[in-house]
């Protein structure tokens, strides 16, 4: 989410399962950038969120391993999640209906389905390859700016670049200049305050590339950063 680090989730799952610990993976940051095979990962749960998959806000999905489904009790009551009910007992429907009480977000669910179908049509391998090309190009261009400090420089990373600028310029000020030049970045601690403390910074700007971005837009980012450096450097 901040550094673009690709985590060895399979190794974490294997280590946790050796101790009898179930694993929930927040795949919101990964699923949009690369193919995901939950069977290969070996996780018990894998959650995704719609608005980070080109879908509508308020939507999402979760994979639950069938063995875990059998162990879990519903957390919410409502229509369609019960098979029979009396004053003495309740019999739940089979999963997944057991966990889907009441009326779902119908429009959001349809929108998320269309977004996922679109991504499948483009192809996750193709998306990953395109973003890898962008990442390598951006890494080359950004490391050429000796007054820009990149946070997280592993060779094998997603197309996400967090940075600070030499001098006293705050990330919010830098992002304002970039915005004036038509470049959208995120500025702040990115819900990762402890990481900011570890890096020794109060905030960073984060440029994230997706399947719709181009190398020309990387150049636009660099041009806007050079302008910001002229103003704040």
Question: What does each of the following model-derived ranges do?
Answer:
Residues 1-233:
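Pyridoxal 5′-phosphate
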